Amino acid sequence: MPPKSSTTKHIFVTGGVASSLGKGLTASSLGMLLKARGLRVVMQKLDPYLNVDPGTMNPFQHGEVFVTNDGAETDLDIGHYERFLDRDLDGSANVTTGQVYSTVIAKERRGEYLGDTVQVIPHITNEIKHRIRRMATDEVDVVITEVGGTVGDIESLPFLETVRQVRHEVGRDNVFVVHISLLPYIGPSGELKTKPTQHSVAALRNIGIQPDAIVLRCDREVPTAIKRKISLMCDVDEAAVVACPDARSIYDIPKVIHTEGLDAYVVRRMDLPFRDVDWTTWDDLLDRVHNPEHEIVMALVGKYIDLPDAYLSVTEALRAGGFANKARVKIKWVTSDDCKTPAGARVQLGDVDAICIPGGFGERGVTGKVGAIQYARENGIPLLGLCLGLQCIVVEAARNLAGVADANSTEFDPATAHPVVSTMAEQLDIVAGEGDMGGTMRLGMYPAKLAEGSIVREVYDGKEYVEERHRHRYEVNNAYRAELEKKAGIVFSGTSPDGKLVEYVEYPRDVHPYLVATQAHPELRSRPTRPHPLFAGLVKAAVERKTSK
């Protein structure tokens, strides 16, 4: 159905009262509903920090770095957008204050402002506006832009001023602002309090933005009287005051906000062409989420487990692997340091059905990851290694099977006598401190050729060539490949098309049912409705192992 007008519509999502309210999930759910109504939707996140991208940020502070097909290192919310929309996004989906200022300062140095005094308004806001409006192509009906931070933060002001200007320039009928606010419950008095939301909306109006809808985040159902009060005090239609209580699964959120009528209100208010929501695919997903036939325990052995967001795409990919097998995947968070010794590994991993070794950087925790791999190999526990996980599998094989006791990676010991994992040639200067760390890894989508008869070729449905997203500086040292295959029995089952870079390793089926690893980050391409084959294969192996006991 063609749009009634050629103007691409803009929906802006802001947050108030507190951070971590789930703006990204709410925006993603709205995007999924609009797509299910036949609209072409793209999404974008505006991040108010001064880093150019999150690539050099501590995972404990920021969570995971989500890499897009074109190699951009972006915010984890971009992962939510891709999973809910089932659409690949690119680097333009994440705009940071650092990117904006870098561009404006570079233009000033080139003399592009012709003597102007460069200021936040109009130069910074114009650059933000350009990055928002360039998403509005002829192939897009709706752009949903999430404004990071909380209304009232100093850092968010240029972005919010830009939202006001966009609304003025493209027309009020073409812009819709959704404000997400916390509705706290005060236990002793037994009341839901509306005052924080009123103050948050007042702060937004002070900047010149009147929200068109308010989403109330709370831990319980919201009475109609509370909605009416917020509608009156915040000057929003009662139909546009939407309650979004905590859900059992994040994949329930689209149904929640659809039941509250947000998507219907948006399409009518913006005069968008629409059809009824097609729930076919999503209902099948929810059936798999809530009515599993199996349950398995999956150990995620990592070094950043105090902040689960550091492994967000991995955990979602593991759960999606469960959906593919009608299984519920319970994540057991295991600190890698607890697996340093065989006894420690046995305590942590003795009761699990499968293990995932995710990526990471630096020496801390690596000994434990190697210990976990040894335990899985010796006890036939299905294991999937990702990026650093692959490198640790190669190190473990060299040390314990090939007789190279001091085998290591140059990342952990630059002077190691046996660098079975080494720095990629083009990364040597950067590792030596002679280049920028940010945005310089092997990033983005790269192809691989899979060996005939291998487990990975089988799980990829027999495909000879596959593509995955990458983020690494180190690779398996080709000088040790023949020795490791001969002495350790490990199979290098996938390489770059020229055969020079190891992309997949595994053990033969008669040695281990499923000990597989990839240098890539396949979790970044997993979707709840289209689980990634490597994760589906891992869960399948775990279910088979558990049911055969």
Swiss-Prot record:
Keywords: ATP-binding, Glutamine amidotransferase, Ligase, Magnesium, Metal-binding, Nucleotide-binding, Pyrimidine biosynthesis. Allosterically activated by GTP, when glutamine is the substrate; GTP has no effect on the reaction when ammonia is the substrate. The allosteric effector GTP functions by stabilizing the protein conformation that binds the tetrahedral intermediate(s) formed during glutamine hydrolysis. Inhibited by the product CTP, via allosteric rather than competitive inhibition. SUPFAM superfamilies: Class I glutamine amidotransferase-like, P-loop containing nucleoside triphosphate hydrolases. Mg(2+) binds at D77, E146. The keyword Magnesium applies. GO terms for molecular function: ATP binding; CTP synthase activity; glutaminase activity; identical protein binding; metal ion binding. GO terms for biological process: 'de novo' CTP biosynthetic process; CTP biosynthetic process; pyrimidine nucleobase biosynthetic process. UTP binds at S19, K193, T194, K195, P196, T197, Q198, K229. InterPro entries: Class_I_gatase-like, CTP_synthase, CTP_synthase_N, GATASE, GATase1_CTP_Synthase, P-loop_NTPase. L-glutamine binds at G360, L388, G389, L390, Q391, E411, R473. GO terms for cellular component: cytosol. ATP binds at S20, L21, G22, K23, G24, L25, D77. The active site is at C387 (nucleophile), H521, E523. Homotetramer. This is CTP synthase. It comes from Streptomyces coelicolor (strain ATCC BAA-471 / A3(2) / M145). The lineage of its organism: Bacteria, Bacillati, Actinomycetota, Actinomycetes, Kitasatosporales.
